[in-house]
C-alpha cells in the first residue's frame, strides 16, 4: 500500500540528488524533525558524507562554446560493416529506425542505407550536411537529416541550448510514434560520446530514462554507444571491483541490460575540429585523449524496470537511496536504513535475505532495487521515507 504522496517540481528533486544532505519528497515522506518527535524505536542519527561531484551530479550546462568540441566519426568501412551487423542483427532492416548521432562524413550512414535501414542522422556540424543528403541516392534505405546535436537535445531545467531542440517536435515531424514500455525496442540510437562530457551525458540520459522523458517517451529506446575504457569499466562494475563500483553502475544496471559488443581501435575513427587541428590543453593531451580505443556498449532498457513500487513518479527516491548508501559504502546497510526510512530495517533485510552487517559495497544492483521495492510496499508506516529540509535546495 502506498502512503500519501507529496511531489515537488523536477528541479527540486534533481537538486536534492546533486548536493549533500537528502531533500527528497516522494511517496510517503516525512521530515526528520517530524519523525524524531514520533520516533520510538531508537533510530540513530547517521549523517552521510556527500558524494563527490564526479560520481553523482546534476547535468550542469555545457552549451555551445565559441569553439566546438572535437568530434569523432567512423572512418573505416570495415568497422562500419561490423557496426551494421551489431545494430541490425537479424531483424528486418526496413522496420528498424536507427538514430545516428553526428555521423560526420557518413561512412556508417551509407553502410546502414545499403543494408536497407531507415536512418535519421542528427548532425551538429553544418559542414557535413551537404555530404549526407546525397547518400540516399541509389540506396535501399531511407535517410532523413536533422541539423542538431542529439546529446544536447531536451536540455534539463536551467540549461540553455541554442537552438532549443525538442525531441517531441522532431519525432512528430519524422512520424515516430510512442509505443508501450512492454513492447519491443522501437528505436535504436548509435553515437560516440564526446570525450569531455561522457559522464555528464550518461547522467542526463539516466534521468531521462527513469522519468520516461525525452526519447524515452517513445518506449524502450536502445542505446549503442562508444565510450572510453574508463567509463566502460565503471558502467559494468560490480562489487567484485569495489574501486570502480559506484552509483552510476547500480542505476544503469538496474535500468538496462548493459552488454559489451566490441572494442574498436582509435585508428577506425576520424576527428573533426572547427579549426581543423587539435590543441593541447593546459593540463592534458587532447590528442592522446582522442587516440584511445573505444568500447561499444549496448544499453537496452528492461521491460521489468518499472513496477508498482518503482515508477517515474518515485524514481528520485530510489536514486537518493543508492546515493545515500554509497556515501559511506563500507557502513552496515542497516545504519543507512535507520537514517533513510521509518520502517523496521531488520524486517526489511530479512525479507530480502540480507544480513544487517552487509554493506552497500557488497550489494549488487538488483539488491538495491529489491530493497527499495520492499520498503515501498511495506505497510509498517504511512510515511516510509525521511528527508532533511534544506532551504538552499528549494530553488528553481
UniProtKB/Swiss-Prot annotation:
**Which UniProt key words apply to this protein?**
Methyltransferase, Mitochondrion, RNA-binding, rRNA processing, S-adenosyl-L-methionine, Transcription, Transcription regulation, Transferase, Transit peptide
Q: Does the keyword rRNA processing apply?
A: yes
Region entry DNA-binding, spans: 328-329
| Region (Disordered), start-end ranges | 43-71
Q: Which GO terms describe its biological process?
A: transcription initiation at mitochondrial promoter
Enumerate the transmembrane spans: none
* UniProt-recorded Gene Ontology molecular function terms: mitochondrial transcription factor activity; RNA binding; rRNA (adenine-N6,N6-)-dimethyltransferase activity; rRNA (adenine-N6-)-methyltransferase activity
Could you tell me which InterPro entries the record lists for this protein?
KsgA/Erm, rRNA_Ade_methylase_Trfase_N, SAM-dependent_MTases_sf
Transit peptide residues according to the UniProt entry: 1-43
Sites binding S-adenosyl-L-methionine sit at 74, 123, 149
GO CC, sorted alphabetically, is: mitochondrial nucleoid; mitochondrion
- Tissue specificity field: Ubiquitously expressed.
Alphabetized Pfam families for the sequence: RrnaAD (PF00398)
SUPFAM superfamilies, alphabetized: S-adenosyl-L-methionine-dependent methyltransferases
Its chief place of residence is: mitochondrion
Describe, as the record does, how this protein assembles with itself and its partners.
Answer: Homodimer. Component of the mitochondrial transcription initiation complex, composed at least of TFB2M, TFAM and POLRMT. In this complex TFAM recruits POLRMT to the promoter whereas TFB2M induces structural changes in POLRMT to enable promoter opening and trapping of the DNA non-template strand. Interacts with mitochondrial RNA polymerase POLRMT. Interacts with TFAM.
Q: Which family does it belong to?
A: Belongs to the class I-like SAM-binding methyltransferase superfamily. rRNA adenine N(6)-methyltransferase family. KsgA subfamily.
Primary role: S-adenosyl-L-methionine-dependent rRNA methyltransferase which may methylate two specific adjacent adenosines in the loop of a conserved hairpin near the 3'-end of 12S mitochondrial rRNA. Component of the mitochondrial transcription initiation complex, composed at least of TFB2M, TFAM and POLRMT that is required for basal transcription of mitochondrial DNA. In this complex, TFAM recruits POLRMT to a specific promoter whereas TFB2M induces structural changes in POLRMT to enable promoter opening and trapping of the DNA non-template strand.
The protein here is known as Dimethyladenosine transferase 2, mitochondrial
Amino acid at each position: 500500500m502506498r502512503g500519501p504522496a507529496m511531489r515537488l517540481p523536477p528541479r527540486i528533486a534533481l537538486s536534492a540528488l546533486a548536493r549533500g544532505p537528502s531533500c527528497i519528497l516522494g511517496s510517503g515522506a516525512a521530515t526528520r524533525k517530524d519523525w524524531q518527535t514520533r520516533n520510538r524505536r531508537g533510530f540513530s542519527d547517521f549523517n552521510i558524507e556527500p558524494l563527490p561531484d564526479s560520481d553523482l551530479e546534476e547535468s550542469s550546462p555545457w552549451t555551445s562554446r565559441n569553439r566546438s568540441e572535437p568530434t569523432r566519426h567512423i572512418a573505416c568501412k570495415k568497422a562500419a560493416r561490423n557496426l551494421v551487423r551489431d545494430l541490425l542483427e537479424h531483424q528486418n532492416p526496413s522496420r528498424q529506425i536507427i538514430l545516428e548521432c553526428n555521423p560526420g562524413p557518413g561512412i556508417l550512414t551509407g553502410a546502414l542505407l545499403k543494408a536497407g535501414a531507415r536512418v535519421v542522422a542528427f548532425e551538429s556540424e553544418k559542414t557535413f550536411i551537404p555530404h549526407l543528403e546525397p547518400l540516399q541516392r541509389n540506396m535501399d534505405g531511407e535517410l532523413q537529416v536533422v541539423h542538431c546535436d542529439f546529446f544536447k537535445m531536451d536540455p534539463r531545467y536551467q540549461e540553455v541550448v541554442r537552438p532549443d531542440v525538442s525531441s517531441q517536435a522532431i519525432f512528430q515531424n519524422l512520424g515516430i510514434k510512442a509505443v508501450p514500455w512492454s513492447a519491443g525496442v522501437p528505436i535504436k540510437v548509435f553515437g560516440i560520446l564526446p570525450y569531455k562530457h561522457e559522464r555528464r551525458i550518461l547522467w542526463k540520459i539516466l534521468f531521462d530514462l527513469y522519468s520516461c522523458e525525452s526519447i524515452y517517451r517513445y518506449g524502450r529506446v536502445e542505446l549503442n554507444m562508444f565510450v572510453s575504457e574508463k567509463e566502460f569499466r565503471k558502467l559494468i562494475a560490480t562489487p567484485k571491483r569495489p574501486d570502480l563500483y559506484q552509483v552510476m553502475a547500480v542505476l544503469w544496471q538496474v535500468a538496462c541490460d548493459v552488454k559489451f559488443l566490441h572494442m574498436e581501435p582509435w585508428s577506425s575513427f576520424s576527428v573533426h575540429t572547427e579549426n581543423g587541428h587539435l590543441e593541447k590543453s593546459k593540463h592534458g593531451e587532447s590528442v592522446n585523449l582522442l587516440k584511445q580505443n573505444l568500447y561499444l556498449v549496448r544499453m537496452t532498457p528492461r521491460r521489468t524496470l518499472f513496477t508498482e513500487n518503482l515508477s517515474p513518479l518515485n524514481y528520485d527516491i530510489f536514486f537518493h537511496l543508492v546515493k545515500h548508501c554509497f556515501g559511506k559504502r563500507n557502513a552496515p546497510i542497516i545504519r543507512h536504513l535507520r537514517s533513510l526510512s521509518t520502517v523496521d530495517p531488520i524486517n526489511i533485510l530479512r525479507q530480502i535475505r540480507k544480513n544487517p552487517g552487509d554493506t552497500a559495497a557488497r550489494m549488487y544492483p538488483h539488491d538495491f532495487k529489491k530493497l527499495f521495492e520492499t520498503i515501498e510496499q511495506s505497510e509498517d508506516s504511512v510515511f516510509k521515507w525521511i528527508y532533511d529540509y534544506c532551504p538552499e535546495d528549494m530553488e528553481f
